[in-house]
């Protein structure tokens, strides 16, 4: 768990410094999370630099105005405090601004992947919410409404 928190801290620091890549020490779980980030388009990619030391280089992704797609990465479930959600309640979670990583009996999945899998099952599956990633994808119309609200 500490390795993963170090990876999240390195990504956040790299994004604040506008770095193109950061180097971290990886593990099986780190590779799994990074491949999910890459599939969702949150990072450009990652590459194993040194196999014996498990060093991984993460290539960060920015918008054209050099703002990052990632806003925050929260580790929700820790050793003593775990957050579980039932399969029936998955439909109520808003995936527009946040990306949820849920650990189920099928492994670590994003919320949309779990919803698709639940459509095929008789009884919907829930799981443990491990991580929440806040994404900087704000609709321009919503930004205008927020500005107008603050001007009044």
UniProtKB/Swiss-Prot annotation:
InterPro entries: Ribosomal_uS8 (IPR000630), Ribosomal_uS8_sf (IPR035987). It comes from the Eukaryota. It holds the Pfam family Ribosomal_S8. It is found in: Mitochondrion. One of its GO terms (cellular component) is mitochondrion. Keywords: Mitochondrion, Ribonucleoprotein, Ribosomal protein. The keyword Mitochondrion applies. Gene3D superfamilies: 3.30.1370.30. Transmembrane segments: none annotated. SUPFAM superfamilies: Ribosomal protein S8 (SSF56047). Belongs to the universal ribosomal protein uS8 family. This is Small ribosomal subunit protein uS8m. It comes from Dictyostelium discoideum (Social amoeba).
